[in-house]
C-alpha cells in the first residue's frame, strides 16, 4: 500500500476528462490521478510535492489517486466504498464540492448538491447520502463520541463530529477540537462555523 508519494513534480495534465500529476521519486515517475481543484494548488513543475495517495487495484489496472491533504484521501476512500461510486465519480464529487461542503451535503442529505457533480444522478446521490451517513453514525458510536453527554445529542455537535471523522480525524482529535473551540462558539448554531473553527484548531496543532 502506497500511502503517499513525495518528490519532484514532473508534469501535470488532463486525460480523458481526468487530471493527473507525475511525481519523480528517485528517478521513477509515479502517475497520480486527482482532480482539477488539486492540480490548481500544486507547486510549479520541478518543485517538491507531497501527495497523500490511495491505491486502487483492479483486474486490468493499478492506479494511484492522490490529494494534498490526508483528510481528502480518507474521504475519497469513503466515497469509492459506496456501491456504484467508482474513482472517476469520486473525483468528480471532490472537484465539484470542497471536502467540508461534500461532507455536509452527505450528512444533511442534500442530494441536490451531490447531484451537481458530473455523472451523479438523483438515485446515486440518495444512495451516497444514505450509506455514508449510516456508516459514519455507526463509526461515531463505536468510537465513543456519542458518550460525550448532552452535547452529543445536539444536531450541530453530531454533524460536526461525523464531518471530522469523515475527513480522517481520529475520535480523540475530534473531542479535543470541540472542547477547545466550544467557549468561543457559544451560541453558534451553524454546523459550518463549528466545522471551520474545529479544522482551524486542528491545523494549528499539527
UniProtKB/Swiss-Prot annotation:
Domain of life: Bacteria
Pfam families referenced in this protein's UniProt entry, alphabetically: HHH_5, RuvA_C, RuvA_N
Subcellular locations according to the entry: Cytoplasm
GO MF entries: ATP binding; four-way junction DNA binding; four-way junction helicase activity
Span list, region Domain I: 1-68
Keyword terms of this UniProt record: Cytoplasm, DNA damage, DNA recombination, DNA repair, DNA-binding
Coiled coil: none
Region (Flexible linker): 147-151
Protein name according to UniProt: Holliday junction branch migration complex subunit RuvA
Upper classification of the organism: Bacteria, Bacillati, Cyanobacteriota, Cyanophyceae, Gloeobacterales
Amino acid at each position: 500500500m502506497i500511502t503517499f508519494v513525495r518528490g519532484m513534480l514532473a508534469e501535470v495534465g488532463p486525460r480523458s476528462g481526468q487530471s493527473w500529476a507525475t511525481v519523480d521519486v528517485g528517478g521513477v515517475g509515479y502517475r497520480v490521478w486527482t482532480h482539477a481543484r488539486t492540480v490548481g494548488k500544486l507547486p510549479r513543475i520541478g518543485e517538491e510535492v507531497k501527495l497523500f495517495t490511495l491505491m486502487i487495484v483492479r483486474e486490468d489496472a493499478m492506479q494511484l489517486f492522490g490529494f494534498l491533504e490526508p483528510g481528502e484521501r480518507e474521504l475519497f476512500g469513503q466515497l469509492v466504498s459506496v456501491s456504484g461510486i467508482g474513482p472517476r465519480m469520486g473525483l468528480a464529487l471532490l472537484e465539484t464540492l470542497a471536502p467540508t461542503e461534500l461532507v455536509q451535503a452527505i450528512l444533511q442529505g442534500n442530494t441536490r448538491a451531490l447531484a451537481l457533480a458530473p455523472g451523479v444522478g438523483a438515485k446515486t446521490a440518495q444512495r451516497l447520502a444514505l450509506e455514508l451517513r449510516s456508516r459514519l453514525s455507526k463509526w461515531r458510536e463505536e468510537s465513543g463520541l456519542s458518550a460525550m453527554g448532552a452535547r452529543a445529542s445536539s444536531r450541530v455537535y453530531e454533524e460536526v463530529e461525523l464531518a471530522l471523522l469523515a475527513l480522517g480525524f481520529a475520535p480523540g482529535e475530534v473531542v479535543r477540537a470541540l472542547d477547545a473551540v466550544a467557549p468561543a462558539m457559544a451560541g453558534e448554531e451553524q454546523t459550518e462555523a463549528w466545522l471551520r473553527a474545529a479544522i482551524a484548531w486542528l491545523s494549528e496543532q499539527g
